[in-house]
């Protein structure tokens, strides 16, 4: 297996223009495909997860042109649901939850038979709450291997709407997927959320993009969503993909630990992504943060431990776990049960790897506490085919200790040139 050893970084300083957001890119691509008219997406993320979505759309008959650097995509929308004349068209979606879940819902609207599959880890990531909701709305979906998990076989029969319950406690992607399909149902859909809805800011991203594509939804305090029937997505013409706020977290944290200062552009006060709130968590730890409409600047600060509920920003919360290695006291990251069903079981993985560098760690069912050692140890970090594990643990190099990252290429899921960008900021 390939590995990368990062030598100690004495200072971080500079500016980074963020790659496009994964969450925004894949949502916008799907809606552009369903819309009538042409959409030009700019600052599209070039990564594995986006490639899986693009490959699926091509197989589904969507005509698009991708620029040479893969950041501009012109999509000629179908103006209707997907159709397949191939018997059981198979779509391989890697480990891309942002492709698997929304496509599972969207394909129920169309005509034909579809099989959705992916990498072994994808077959361990739950999808049962979404499938149950789709079936309640009239969909024909079956599990091909294990109950509640991909791969799925879908027969396009349309969605009839009605009253549907969705469990919101594991992943907001189930609700996102259903919301994006519901406007094309034959009857009005009322979606009732069962349990506490996790990652609410990701639902805001979904609703914002749907509105941009001309669809109306009534949100009743995130408990009930009413979606009028027989709507159509309309191409907005130009669509700028915001920078990826989760990806910004590593550079903002690096500046807080070892700045100088770092300015990240592509997100800011006007961002639709909840993960920009990571900067508030850094500020609570003692970093100095400046906000613009489309940029955030972080300066070095004396960092102290925090005890915080991170249910709203679970992805960016991972960066707090390794930032905690540089903070005084014990940091507690709470209410992140859904770490367990992400690219890997992130609570177990994070606890294991933090202990390798010398931290004292308590891993609970839905929380983790981290007490840093007096001095970090040089360790070889396993990344579990999880892009965020690799990027989070790169921050260890901001100490006086090197760090070795196994399988650094796993960052290609969302940020293929992450380590190059980190090097550019290292003084």
Swiss-Prot record:
Its EC number is 2.5.1.19. It catalyses: 3-phosphoshikimate + phosphoenolpyruvate = 5-O-(1-carboxyvinyl)-3-phosphoshikimate + phosphate. It is found in: Cytoplasm. Its main location: cytoplasm. The active site is at 315 (proton acceptor). HAMAP family: EPSP_synth. This is 3-phosphoshikimate 1-carboxyvinyltransferase. It comes from Aliivibrio salmonicida (strain LFI1238). The lineage of its organism: Bacteria, Pseudomonadati, Pseudomonadota, Gammaproteobacteria, Vibrionales.
């Amino acid at each position: 297996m390939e590995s990368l050893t990062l030598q100690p970084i004495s200072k971080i300083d500079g500016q980074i223009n963020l790659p496009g957001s994964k969450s925004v890119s894949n949502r916008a691509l799907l809606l552009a495909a369903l819309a009538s008219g042409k959409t030009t997406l700019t600052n599209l993320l070039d990564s594995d997860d986006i490639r899986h979505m693009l490959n699926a759309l091509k197989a589904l008959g969507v005509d698009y042109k991708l620029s040479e650097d893969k950041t501009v995509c012109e999509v000629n929308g179908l103006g209707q649901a997907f159709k397949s004349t191939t018997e059981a068209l198979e779509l391989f979606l890697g480990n891309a939850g942002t492709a698997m879940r929304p496509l599972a819902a969207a394909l129920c609207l169309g005509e034909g038979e579809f099989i959705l599959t992916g990498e072994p880890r994808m077959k361990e990531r739950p999808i049962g709450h979404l499938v149950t909701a789709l079936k309640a709305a009239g969909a024909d979906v079956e599990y091909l291997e294990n109950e509640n998990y991909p791969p799925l076989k879908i027969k396009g029969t349309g969605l009839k709407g009605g009253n549907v319950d969705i469990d919101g406690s594991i992943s907001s992607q189930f609700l996102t997927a259903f919301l994006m399909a519901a406007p094309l149902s034959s009857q009005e859909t009322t979606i009732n959320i069962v349990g506490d809805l996790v990652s609410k800011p990701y639902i805001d991203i979904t609703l914002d993009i749907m509105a941009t594509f001309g669809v109306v939804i009534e949100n009743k305090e995130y408990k009930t969503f009413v979606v009028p029937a027989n709507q159509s997505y309309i191409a907005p013409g130009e669509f700028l993909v915001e920078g990826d706020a989760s990806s910004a977290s590593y550079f903002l944290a690096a500046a807080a630990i070892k700045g100088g200062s770092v300015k990240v552009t592509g997100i800011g006060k006007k961002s639709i992504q909840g993960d920009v709130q990571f900067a508030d968590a850094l500020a609570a730890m003692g970093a100095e943060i400046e906000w613009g409409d489309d940029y955030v600047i972080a300066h070095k600060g004396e960092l102290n431990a925090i005890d915080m509920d991170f249910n709203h920003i679970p992805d960016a919360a991972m960066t707090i776990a390794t930032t905690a290695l540089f903070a005084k006291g014990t940091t507690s990251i709470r209410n992140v049960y859904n770490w367990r069903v992400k690219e890997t079981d992130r609570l177990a993985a994070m606890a294991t790897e933090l202990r390798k560098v010398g931290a004292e760690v308590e891993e609970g069912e839905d929380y983790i506490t981290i007490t840093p050692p007096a001095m970090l140890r040089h360790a070889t970090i396993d990344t579990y085919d999880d892009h965020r594990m690799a990027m989070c643990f790169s921050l260890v190099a901001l100490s006086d200790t090197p760090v070795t990252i196994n399988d650094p290429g796993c960052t290609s899921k969302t940020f293929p040139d992450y380590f190059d960008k980190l090097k550019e900021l290292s003084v």
